[in-house]
């Protein structure tokens, strides 16, 4: 037997197609939203850490009347930059309070085992906070121990306004070579 029908075709809306298109648009919108929120969160993290860091090279002057070493930082110098901290007369001034990783290496010029007989017995490199004077403290004291190079690093809390100074025993001369003499800081935790 045949079924009887009205014989009249009722136009159907393509609900399935409309529903698929709506879900696809919703999914694309959610992906774009998540991507933009992720970008904003990443940028906020970068801004909150401040990326305070510096890698400095020696600003060498021929005669050393002062034991203090002067530093310079600029991309024009090569592998040298300052982002966050500031250079103040060759010394590094901290702009944000936090825990910093300090690293330093100094190599002496014209240094060999035969020159140690005329070198000072207590040839040292000192890295410390020299300003403000109420907060002045030595952070690293490195003895050359009859070698031509010293290097060290450490984590230390620093406050906004601290000025880091490096002193080298007179009359020793540090190497100008950027691979041999450098100093840097990096904020690791605000």
Curated annotation (Swiss-Prot):
The gene is CD70. GO terms for cellular component: plasma membrane. It is found in: Cell membrane. Expressed at the plasma membrane of B cells, it is the ligand of the CD27 receptor which is specifically expressed at the surface of T cells. The CD70-CD27 signaling pathway mediates antigen-specific T cell activation and expansion which in turn provides immune surveillance of B cells. Pfam families: TNF. Belongs to the tumor necrosis factor family. The keyword Glycoprotein applies. It is a single-pass type II membrane protein. Residues 52-188 form the THD domain. GO terms for molecular function: receptor ligand activity; tumor necrosis factor receptor binding. This is CD70 antigen. Homotrimer. N-glycosylated. Residues 39-190 are extracellular. InterPro entries: CD70, TNF_dom, Tumour_necrosis_fac-like_dom. Its main location: membrane. The chain crosses the membrane at residues 18-38. Keywords: Cell membrane, Disulfide bond, Glycoprotein, Membrane, Signal-anchor, Transmembrane, Transmembrane helix. Glycans are attached at residues 59, 110, 167. Residues 1-17 are cytoplasmic. GO terms for biological process: adaptive immune memory response involving T cells and B cells; CD27 signaling pathway; T cell activation; tumor necrosis factor-mediated signaling pathway. It comes from Sus scrofa (Pig). The keyword Glycoprotein applies. PANTHER family: CD70 ANTIGEN. Disulfide bonds join 111-148, 130-165.
